[in-house]
Amino acid sequence: MIKHYLKVAFRNLIKYKTQSLVSIIGLAVGFTCFALSVLWIRYEMTYDNFYEGADRIYLAGSSFRLYGDGFTYNSSSFLADYLAKNCPEIEKVCRIFYDWNEKKIKNEDVEFVVRRIEVDSNFISMFNIKVLDGDNHLQLKKDEIAITENTAKRIFGKESPIGKHLILEESNEEKIIVAVVKSWEGHSLFSFDILLPFHDTNPNWGNQRCQTLFRIYPNCDIEALKQRLSEYEVQQDGHKYPNSTLIAPLSTLRSSHPREDVNVKLNHIRLFACISGLVIICGICNYLTMLITRIRMRKRELALRKVNGSSNGGLLTLLLTELVLLLILSSGIGLVLIELILPTFKRLSQINEGVSFFYIEVFVYILSLIAVTVGFASLLIRYISKRTLLSNINKKSNLHLSGWFYKSSILFQLFIGIAFVFCTLVMMKQLNFLLNTKELGIERHNVGAVVYCSENVPFKEILEQMPDVTKYLSGFQTPIPKMYFSTFRIKEWEGKATDSEQYIDLEDETINQEYADFFGVEVLEGSMLDEKDGKNMVVINEAAVKAFGWTQPVGKKIDKLGRHYIVKGVIKNISYNAPIHPVAPAMFFLPDNTGRGGIIFKVKEGTWNVVSEKIKAEVNKVNPNAELMLSNMEEVYDTYMKSERTLCQLLSIVSFICIAIAVFGIFSLVTLSCQQRRKEIAIRKVNGANIGIILNLFFREYLLLLVFSSFFAFPLGYVMMKHWLENYIKQTPIEWWLYAVIFIGMGFVIFLSIIWRVWKAAQQNPAEVLKGE
């Protein structure tokens, strides 16, 4: 019997091959996107959750408004001792220095790339590092290291690494291996291959180069600890300084405070998972609409099967077999798609796991989706078949596809499709606006910088000899990426209420006319600083004017540590950070001519690669092992929008699939409708209706559905996008033409999808049609 059901199901899929193909492709893409995105979400949410007491482990960071969301992972090496002495809630605290970049090591002239972490003795006990071989106490000295068992196998094979030497290529230091330790049991922000002893060459509260981790006692009030660490005093060199420490749970650190190397933020992954789920729903609705329509077309056949002894369960199994077969085919194609895109997905998601890890989870998710789909479809098909099976068994169906399920399905698919297209276009418009706007305060196109070089290289002379370099600027830190941070607190300024305890934190920046001309900095009020002004004249940005509450800022006085400064001008806000973060108030001074900072230069269009290679070649002439950090400001700024750009690309693909499902669904349903309404069309032609009237009859029905779906999709899309745009400082307007273009475009696509089928039906000879009926 099952074999018979499969034959019938397969023949129906072949008979309606266009509709079946659209459903299979749509569901395959939906299954793939949904399964991978759910896997991705689960992976992101399980970072650093495998330690003992993982829910009680926190990272103590610092606040930098020019860095990401203002939370940095770094802190002073003094902080660990302060926490241990002054915070009774803390059970254990440790210091580490994590090298976020992979480094090279040598073993007998063979190079290996590894991840390194410097740790103190508390780290070993706090994270229960297990020693598999060697020194069980693991008190690392200056020239000693420990490696993981995986690294030991990679470098030494089956030989024991204890007592062997490795050379750190960066510093050319030789280290002796004293222990082999167990790797992390799960994925971590601080994954490592080598453990080195922690050492801070310049410990002070202002030097924030390490990461401080601590574990609190169970049932402690973490909010009270956060409040206490938000503002406290520290002492150094006989002086007291205000300090502030931010803390965040280690298990959610990657999602709550993502670093710049995270490709896609967790909230964007969740959004994509929801959208993928909607694509699956669209595909299933599209197929179920056609399946239920065909059930009602086959009601005489089903009634005859019932009369001849078929049970209700047997009929339900017959009808569900086609759906299950379609879902299995979709799943198979989905698995093929996963195999094709897996390398790209692994790179994008930064999931460094074996192939089996992906397929096991994906298979579970797909089976779950199939089970839920079949369960829902069983209830729906049983309900529809009960209403149609025994009613009017001897009458031929005059179904005109005007049932509630049909209209609801088309409305839902059009609603989702229009909303997808609208949201995707707004996102792409916003992304294009942010990447090309002049509202960021500085010109970054074709601007490069030598951020750091370990050797004394005459870059000025080198750049002057390059015809592709149009101009250069020295003595300033590169604004993007921001490599130099300095802030100070202002407690007194002109216009402040005498009884107020308000203060304002300002960024300490430098500027002059040369800098303003180079970057195109716009002066809004007053004038730019001049060398003749002296050291008491400053300019401030728009954010500082707002913070001080001034309406006429030029000429106002600011007191900094007992010294008075006069505001000479106001410049446009300069965005050093991602556009989702507000610009901090800043005060700009003349440069002190100490020669600090790198060198910034402009290149001709399309010559960045040539210029950068020439600079690297010149540095290699001085020292082949020299460290050089070159920066292209436009490329760096584009990385700030990496997550949004990736989301837009994913949404574009999903939106296309969703629209294709809706359009081909309409095409398929029109095909079935024309087949059902052949007699009606023939009678209308006999009564004088031309092809235009018949075409208008169909198009008007779908146009009304388009109007209704647009009526709900556009307002919802506007509310969602308005809320999303509020995350950005600079926002693109949502203009009226977006609505018009989407509505007209969808109407045109619907018209094209129905015209051919209706035209073909209208061209048939009425006499032949009526004879066949």
Across the structure, where does each feature detected by a protein language model lie?
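Small-residue-rich transmembrane alpha-helices
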Residues: 32, 36, 246, 323-389, ...
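Generic structural signal for small/hydrophobic residues in well-ordered secondary structure
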Residues: 13, 23, 44, 60, ...
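Membrane-helix entry/capping segments
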Residues: 3-6, 11, 15, 19, ...
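Intracellular coupling helices
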Residues: 6-14, 18, 22, 26, ...
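C-terminal transmembrane helical bundles of large multi-pass transporters
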Residues: 625-706, 710, 721
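Mid-to-C-terminal secondary-structure elements
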Residues: 120-133, 145-264, 461-639
